[in-house]
Amino acid sequence: MLGPAYNHTMETPASFLLVGIPGLQSSHLWLAISLSAMYITALLGNTLIVTAIWMDSTRHEPMYCFLCVLAAVDIVMASSVVPKMVSIFCSGDSSISFSACFTQMFFVHLATAVETGLLLTMAFDRYVAICKPLHYKRILTPQVMLGMSMAVTIRAVTFMTPLSWMMNHLPFCGSNVVVHSYCKHIALARLACADPVPSSLYSLIGSSLMVGSDVAFIAASYILILRAVFDLSSKTAQLKALSTCGSHVGVMALYYLPGMASIYAAWLGQDIVPLHTQVLLADLYVIIPATLNPIIYGMRTKQLLEGIWSYLMHFLFDHSNLGS
């Protein structure tokens, strides 16, 4: 409960101050350089994936369509927080308006909720492709793909809307200093003058149920996939199937391990996990998957790598010919 009635407009600060990574201020410049390099890599890699898939009609299969959406979500997630982080680390520009802070919180958490759903749909795609190859096109029709994508998005919005409403109706009458590099829910909740436990419990239980159910279904899919793969008579076919799935497993590990570590480190508190470790984990969580996903999929998926290379050559030579 929020307790007694509050005049919300009087208890809303004009802005918050993001402190970056507490205790590592001396390393902020090096962190800014590293984050900038990773962000540029993420933007280029994910944009190339979206473009290569979008422009080639032969790559409109479910796996590539889901990968295209994943790349777009990674761009949104990284772009929601990294530019402001770099600004804080480089120039000390730590101020962020109240509305911008809550918008940032909404989009970064929405993107993470969409991404876990996408990883589940991609696991289902691999399950159908390997365990039911003859029925692949009949099961994963464009209508089914659209329905799955819509369901993932609606679930994420349904999860985030109550959380945003609860946070937006908390009074912030004390300090406006956010001990974090971006407007993460739990860091903002600690500044509230009223009891933040309802929103914090909703966030923890909701995200645990969402991620837990997705991981359970993904694990079940891969158990069935491995059984089907090892039943194949050809070693070459086994290796090809395992190689295709390996990239997906790598992407899942990059997403779930730092994500869950970040969530539970924040809940354990700084008596167990130092505050700078909590913030650094949360920062890396929003940029590392976006940076490495295109590299993993590009290097492990020969067709996609060829498509990206073909698009780059076409882009470079066409422009050089126009220039001459």
From Swiss-Prot:
Signal peptide: none annotated. Disulfide bonds join C101-C193. The chain crosses the membrane at residues 30-50, 59-79, 104-124, 144-164, 201-221, 242-262, 279-299. The lineage of its organism: Eukaryota, Metazoa, Chordata, Craniata, Vertebrata. One of its GO terms (molecular function) is olfactory receptor activity. One of its GO terms (cellular component) is plasma membrane. It is a multi-pass membrane protein. Glycans are attached at N7. Belongs to the G-protein coupled receptor 1 family. This is Olfactory receptor 52I1. Residues 51-58, 125-143, 222-241, 300-324 are cytoplasmic.
